[in-house]
Structures are given as structure tokens and as C-alpha cells.
A protein has these predicted regions:
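Aromatic/acidic, Gly/Pro-rich catalytic loop(s) in extracytoplasmic/lumenal soluble domains
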Residues: 233, 440-504
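Membrane-interface transmembrane helices that cradle and orient dolichyl/undecaprenyl
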Residues: 2-18, 26, 50-57, 62, ...
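Hydrophobic/aromatic-rich transmembrane helices and adjacent perimembrane loops
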Residues: 219-240, 271-311
Length: 504
């Protein structure tokens, strides 16, 4: 985005090329980043903005010379020239972005071809599209609706916040109306103090009400602390950027930055099944932009008067300030306290693992530290680091923690990794084992999965699994396939603790 802005606003073609390279690399890092190529719309939109401003300037400058046939011809000729210049500029700017985009793709595709072969990449893309048969949250409709779902759900809070805005505007309007009938300076000053005090008090009441009603959690170890404040902030960002884009008096550079931020907030979540979390990752761009716009709003926007009726911006400023303060506190404390753990937050992180270099300096709960301490000690004693491992049981990070490379896929539990692919990869692994007697991957299972394989459903129930765990384990075709493989190749249990089981 920065490359696009510098390239367009300052006319530096090299930055446009760099922006194209960045977008191309983005696609290769994650295929579902493909929609971000829509950032090219910013190039075309800025070209049109420049063209419209040029036409306006032409009409203004020649209009001062008087309305004559000769002047009309000049206007027509200059507008035509401006159109030709626009098309030329659009072609050049688009060409530079496209050149950077294709350069990145060619280099990275070349690397893929050398290391793996393009057919493997194509197969991966085809698997990506076919996985929607079992992973319904990856369908295009599901991902798009998931994104809009949070915007719609958050209307519950936004409508109620709007009530505070209406109350503030009406209250200040009534005080202004009273002041228009009472001409005494002392009364006017008192009314003005009441307006400010009332607006600040209303903002405080709104913030207090939002906290009391559960708009945001005060436990900063889970996502509840920032979900709805974040969605509200994104909604405000989209509204403000649209407002500035279509404000005639806004400078073209401001329209450009507003348009780019609108695009990046809007399209980042496309292609993801994580709702609006990807867009929230762009708050480092949206937040300074919004605070800058809020500062300008407070500085330049006053009251609108119609006869004796006054619509004051004062309560709007105070209420927005209250929300921005709430948001700043929430994201600050969330960033300070949150620790990622299996897609959620975790509390009581007061222990460390002392025999694992990968986890050195990482804080976790005492229970988790005990699990990792035990398995790390066994891996160190047996010299298993560097050995291939087949991991199953929603514990993909163990491959990295223990420095044991995955035999074929570090997270075979995922719905997007279908059983047909697992069968193919395991067949290749077995062929290698048959050809090389020294090659024998370690099997690492989460304990409940291992117990189910060894002793069946009754033994699993003794461990009191949750309903979700039970649904993932019982009659799991992938797990049963791994169990058949272990039986066929004579794997035996060599390590067990409260969380993990190793078979060799």
C-alpha cells in the first residue's frame, strides 16, 4: 500500500513496480491473498480523480476568459488532451504494477519448478478448491458471509451507540435554542459549560454502559476484549474513507490514501475463514489514519445552524473521543496480556520449559510446561531431534517444538487435508520405509487419540473427553488409517505422559 501511495502521489514509477512485486509475493505466500490484487483499483481510481480535477481546472481557467465559440473550442480541445493524458498515465502505471507482479510470480514459480515441479503446485491448488467438500467453512459463500456476519451482528451495538449520539445532539440543540432566546452573556456562558459538561458526561456514560453490557471483555486473555470494538472501528474506518473519497474539497492525495485504506480493510478478509481478524491485522494502517481524521474533525468541524435550530458537533466529538479512548485501552491491554494458545487465549502463564532450546524464554501454564518438559526430556535422551515424525491429534506445533520434521504434513488433522491425500502420502512413506530399512518415522499422538486406538471408545470415555474431542476421535477415518499403519509395521509405545504418547 505504501508503494502504491508513493508511486502514484509522487509520480515515482519504481514504487509502483515494488508494489506489484509485494502483491505478487503475497499470492505465493498464501494463495487466498489473490483478491489483494484488487489494490490495482487504486491506480485506476487515482487516475480518474486526477483527470476530473484537470477537467475542473480547465473549465475554471478558460471560463474566466468569457463564453465565446473560441473558448468553447479550447475547452473541448484541452479536455480531450487531458483524456489522452489520462489513458497514457493509466497504461504506464498499470504496466509498472503488472510488471512487478509478474516478475515476482515468475521468480517464485521458477523456484517452485526447480525444487518441486509446477505440477505439484497445480495439484496443491486443485486440492485447495476440492477441500470445500469436507471443510464447508472454506467455501466462497461461507467465507464472504462469515465476513459480513460480524458487520451485521455488530449493528446491535452500533445502533445503541447511535442513540447516545442522537441524545447528545438533541440535548445540545435544546440548550442552544434556549441560548438564542436568552441574550445575557452570563446565561450563555453557563449554557456553553453545560453543553461541554453534558457531552463529556454522556460519553462517560456510554463507555460505562458498553463495559457493563459486555461490548468488550475486561479479561484481556481472550478475543472478547477486542472483537466488537475492532469491528466497530473497522466500520467507522470504511465510512470515513468513503466520506473523504467523495468529498469534493478533499485533496487528491487524501482521496488516494483513503481509497487505499478502504481497499485494504475491505478485501483482506476475502479468502479467509477467520471472519474479520485479517482486516484487524491492518489496524496499524487504519488506526493512525482514523486518529488523524478525528483530530481534523475536532479542529475544523463546528456547528450547523438553520434559523434557530443548531446541530452541534460537540457531543459527536466527545462521544467519538470516548469510543476511541475505550478502543485504545482495549487493544493496548489486549496486546500486553494476550498469549495465543490453540486459537484462544490462556491465563496463568507462569512456568517455563528448561530442557528445550526452541521453547527457551517462552512462558506457559504450569500444566503445559510439565507436558513439554517430560516429552522434551525423552526426545533429548533418545536423540530423536531431526527424526521424521507423524503427528496426529491437533498438536501440529510439536514438530517445531521438538525439532522433528513432519514426515509429510505437519497438521494432517485439518479437514482441508483430505483422507485421499493422507493415503497417498502414507503410501509414499511406506514405499520409502520398505526400500530403506533405516528410515522409520516416529509416531506422536495426543493421548486421547492414542487411548482410543489402543483400547477403544470405553477407554476413551474414562478420560472424560469433551463432546468436540469425542466427535474428532471416534470413528475418525484418518486416525484409523494411521492405526492400521502402526499395526502393519509393528510400532510400540515407548513414551507416555498426561498429554502425549510416542510410538516407535
Amino acid at each position: 500500500m505504501i508503494g502504491l501511495y508513493l508511486g502514484l502521489a509522487r509520480g515515482k514509477k519504481g514504487w509502483l513496480f515494488a508494489a506489484g512485486v509485494a502483491l505478487g509475493c503475497n499470492v505465493l505466500s498464501r494463495f487466498s491473498n489473490l483478491p489483494e490484487a484488487a489494490m490495482i483499483v487504486g491506480v485506476w481510481a487515482y487516475g480518474i480523480i486526477c483527470w476530473l480535477e484537470a477537467r475542473k481546472e480547465i473549465g475554471k481557467s478558460l471560463g474566466q476568459a468569457g463564453e465565446t465559440t473560441e473558448t468553447a473550442e479550447k475547452i473541448k480541445a484541452r479536455k480531450k488532451a487531458a483524456g489522452v493524458k489520462l489513458r497514457k498515465k493509466l497504461l504506464q502505471d498499470t504496466g509498472m504494477c503488472l510488471a512487478g507482479y509478474l516478475t515476482a510470480l515468475l521468480v517464485l514459480f521458477g523456484y517452485i519448478q526447480i525444487c518441486y515441479g509446477m505440477d505439484e503446485y497445480v495439484k496443491g491448488i486443485l486440492r485447495l478448491f476440492s477441500m470445500t467438500e469436507v471443510a464447508t467453512d472454506y467455501t466462497a459463500a461461507s467465507m464472504i458471509m462469515g465476513m459480513f456476519d460480524w458487520y451485521f451482528q455488530n449493528l446491535y451495538w452500533e445502533i445503541r451507540m447511535c442513540v447516545f449520539f442522537v441524545v447528545g445532539i438533541v440535548t445540545v440543540g435544546v440548550l442552544e435554542l434556549i441560548g438564542s432566546y436568552v441574550r445575557k452573556d452570563t446565561v450563555t456562558k453557563v449554557l456553553r459549560i453545560l453543553e461541554w459538561a453534558g457531552s463529556i458526561a454522556l460519553a462517560a456514560v456510554m463507555v460505562f454502559w458498553l463495559y457493563r453490557q459486555g461490548f468488550c471483555a475486561r479479561e484481556y486473555t481472550n478475543y472478547g476484549a477486542i472483537i466488537w470494538p475492532g469491528v466497530t472501528f473497522l466500520t467507522l474506518t470504511l465510512l470515513v474513507t468513503l466520506w473523504r473519497i467523495f468529498t469534493p474539497s478533499a485533496p487528491k492525495e487524501e482521496k488516494l490514501i483513503s481509497g487505499l485504506i478502504f481497499l485494504i480493510v475491505w478485501i483482506t478478509s476475502l479468502g479467509s475463514n477467520n471472519k474479520l481478524y485479517p482486516s484487524m491485522n491492518n489496524l496499524f494502517l487504519a488506526l493512525p489514519y482514523m486518529y488523524w481524521q478525528f483530530y481534523r474533525f475536532c479542529k475544523y468541524v463546528g456547528s450547523f445552524r438553520w434559523k434557530r435550530i443548531t446541530i452541534s458537533a460537540m457531543p459527536v466529538k466527545c462521544l467519538l473521543g470516548g469510543f476511541f479512548l475505550l478502543f485504545f485501552v482495549q487493544v493496548g491491554l489486549f496486546g500486553r496480556n494476550f498469549a495465543f494458545a490453540e486459537g484462544t487465549g490462556i491465563q496463568d502463564i507462569d512456568a517455563q520449559v528448561t530442557n528445550n532450546e526452541t521453547l527457551k524464554g517462552v512462558w506457559m501454564s504450569e500444566e503445559r510446561a510439565g507436558w513439554m518438559q517430560g516429552i522434551s526430556e525423552y526426545v533429548n535422551e533418545r536423540g530423536l531431534a531431526g527424526r521424521d515424525v507423524l503427528i496426529y491429534g491437533q498438536i501440529p506445533a510439536l514438530s517445531y517444538y521438538l525439532q522433528m520434521p513432519a514426515a509429510f504434513n505437519p497438521w494432517p488433522d485439518l479437514d482441508s487435508y483430505q483422507i485421499a491425500q493422507l493415503e497417498e502420502d502414507m503410501h509414499k512413506m511406506q514405499e520409502r520405509m520398505d526400500a530403506d530399512a533405516t528410515y522409520r518415522p516416529v509416531i506422536l499422538l495426543e493421548k486421547k487419540y492414542a487411548v482410543y486406538l489402543e483400547a477403544g471408545e470405553d477407554a476413551l470415555e474414562a478420560l472424560q473427553p469433551t463432546e468436540r474431542e469425542r466427535s474428532l476421535i471416534v470413528d475418525n477415518a484418518k486416525l484409523l488409517l494411521i492405526g492400521e499403519f502402526m499395526d502393519a509395521y509393528g510400532y510400540e509405545k515407548t513414551f507416555e505422559n498426561e498429554k502425549f504418547v510416542i510410538f516407535e
